[in-house]
């Protein structure tokens, strides 16, 4: 029988896309193209939080000390808060190369947004849709 490891794990949950399907008037925002056609929910799992924190600080130092990047307006914001949608491609490349070396696991769940299915399965309630996404994301993952 395999012995259970006793180590502390850390989970960071994030989403991408807009979970909305309809506006307040009941108009289908997905069909109109006013919101994303997919909604993604994911998490990062690690037991190396201190190492990852140091790596992120090293990334910020590398960006701060790169003379080429200093003239890019968005870099000042990146030094405070890294976020792929706001960071310039050069910063994203530095971050992605560093992520490859980190001790992390990522799990994602992607939903294609279908307004008819949303009405039938979730009674057009965003909270039920989000709850379903969370359940699917963590299904058979946490013990």
Where are these regions (language model features)?
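Phosphate-ester processing/binding pockets and catalytic centers
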Residues: 1-143
